[in-house]
């Protein structure tokens, strides 16, 4: 998962430089300090060898010691001799050594050691290390350090490569996922099954991303509703203009004919009454237009309401109308029927539906309000509407044939009901049943 070679190369070189630098410093430190440690170690070995040999000489006679010292000096890099044999600080033995009192330089000199021989004599043996230990230590280092340094460099290279990949792969993974999140992909998420730090961070980012998507979807939904409302307003204004234009044109014709006393229009009282009726129709239409423009305000709040008390109040308003038509109203709702919407919106929906159910029921018909399987049901006995009428029934200012025959309704009622229910995202249907029509609203 290498998405950024430059970053990988840069991080690799940084890690390699650090490890290689540390390795170099360590090797330099070893080169500078090891000779002193080696001198100390050789000194301890030298002391131990001299002590052991001195103990061995105690078992020999004074005549045997010179030959033993000579053999000892030949087999080792240590010169051993009797101190009495030193003449002008030079020894005609195995080694010619320039010994400086009190200063060893590159040599290690053992102090005189007294030996009691087997024949009871007391002799002093002097041991001298005849090798440049400091130089020998450096030679040893120069023999091995180049190889160990190459091994260190190789290890640093391999370790830096795999360490950098292991370090950066989670970052590349985070970068890849967050880049897809920038495109608002609903299906992209961090793998929360990871047990490392990325898994923990991923859980937090997933939570934030899900909340962000939720907010964005809500905003998109609201924007769609706003666009829809704007389109509805345009259609509404056009429809309202058309609905007002027709009665105004009719009223103008009546008044002009009355002005010129043409035909029956000479009967002014009769046509003044008709003109007033036209004006009342336009006034009623304007009231409905103003009311329908407020449905957005009605749907801004939500509360849980019991439907029955609101319905009882509405039925009391239409009791006289129902009685005049001979329509029987059956309210089968209980106090358990509840809905989430504003009181004004609920009142407007039920008022329009109950009003239509009563107006367009058969003479001596029935209106039944009940709750069925989570739906509020309003049935009325009437002639079922055709499929063509049902298709356009919720369009603004639409008039079905039944409506036109019975009333001069504007057609705004069901349009308002449709908009309110859609604003609350409530499912609804208006379909024929065996005795008439049924309007159902999901609760």
Curated annotation (Swiss-Prot):
It is found in: Cell membrane. The keyword Kinase applies. Residues 239-443 form the Histidine kinase domain. InterPro entries: Bact_Sensor_His_Kinase, HAMP_dom, HATPase_C_sf, His_kinase_dom, HisK_dim/P_dom, HisK_dim/P_sf. The keyword Transmembrane helix applies. The modification Phosphohistidine is found at residue 242. It is an enzyme of class 2 (transferase). The chain crosses the membrane at residues 16-36, 140-160. Residues 165-217 form the HAMP domain. Pfam families: HAMP (PF00672), HATPase_c (PF02518), HisKA (PF00512). Its EC number is 2.7.13.3. Its main location: membrane. It is a multi-pass membrane protein. GO terms for molecular function: ATP binding; phosphorelay sensor kinase activity. Probably part of an rr06-hk06 operon. Member of the two-component regulatory system HK06/RR06 involved in regulation of target genes, including choline-binding protein CbpA. Has been shown in one study to not be required for regulation of expression of choline-binding protein CbpA. This is Sensor histidine protein kinase HK06. It comes from Streptococcus pneumoniae serotype 2 (strain D39 / NCTC 7466).
């Amino acid at each position: 998962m290498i998405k950024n070679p430059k970053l990988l190369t840069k991080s690799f070189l940084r890690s390699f430089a650090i490890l290689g630098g540390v390795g170099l410093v360590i090797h330099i430190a070893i080169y500078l300090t090891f000779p002193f440690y080696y001198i100390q170690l050789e000194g301890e070995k030298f002391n131990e060898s001299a002590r052991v040999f001195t103990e061995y000489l105690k078992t020999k006679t004074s005549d045997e010691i010179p030959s033993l010292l000579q053999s000892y000096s030949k087999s080792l890099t240590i010169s051993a001799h009797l101190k009495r044999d030193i003449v002008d600080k030079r020894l005609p033995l195995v080694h010619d050594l320039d010994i400086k009192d009190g200063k060893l330089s590159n040599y290690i000199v053992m102090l005189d050691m007294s030996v009691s021989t087997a024949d009871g004599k007391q002799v002093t043996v002097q041991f001298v290390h005849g090798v440049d230990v400091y130089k020998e230590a450096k030679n040893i280092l120069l023999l091995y350090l180049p190889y160990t340094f190459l091994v260190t460099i190789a290890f640093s290279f391999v370790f830096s490569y795999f360490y950098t990949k292991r370090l950066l792969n989670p970052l590349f993974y985070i970068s890849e996922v967050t880049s897809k999140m920038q495109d608002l992909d609903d299906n992209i998420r961090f793998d929360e099954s990871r047990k490392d730090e990325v898994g923990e961070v991923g859980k937090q980012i997933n939570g934030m991303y899900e909340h962000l998507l939720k907010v964005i979807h809500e905003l998109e939904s609201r924007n769609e509703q706003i666009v829809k409302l704007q389109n509805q307003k345009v259609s509404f204004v056009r429809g309202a203009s058309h609905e007002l234009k027709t009665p105004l044109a009719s009223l103008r014709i009546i008044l002009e004919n009355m002005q010129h006393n043409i035909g029956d229009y000479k009967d002014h009282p009769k046509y003044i009454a008709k003109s007033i009726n036209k004006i009342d129709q336009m006034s009623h239409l304007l009231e409905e237009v103003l009311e329908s423009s407020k449905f957005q305000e009605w749907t801004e709040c939500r509360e849980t309401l019991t439907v029955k008390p609101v319905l009882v109040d509405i039925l009391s308003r239409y009791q006289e109308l129902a009685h005049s038509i001979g329509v029987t109203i059956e309210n089968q709702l209980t106090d358990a029927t509840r809905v989430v919407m504003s009181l004004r919106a609920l009142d407007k929906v039920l008022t329009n539906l109950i009003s239509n159910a009563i107006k367009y029921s058969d003479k001596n018909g029935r209106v039944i309000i009940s709750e069925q399987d989570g739906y509020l049901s309003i049935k009325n006995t009437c002639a079922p509407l055709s499929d063509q009428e049902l298709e356009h029934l919720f369009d603004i200012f639409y008039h079905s044939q039944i409506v036109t025959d019975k009333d001069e309704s504007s057609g705004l009622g069901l349009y308002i009901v449709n908009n309110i229910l859609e604003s609350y995202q409530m499912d609804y249907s208006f379909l024929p049943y065996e005795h008439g029509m049924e309007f159902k609203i999901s609760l």
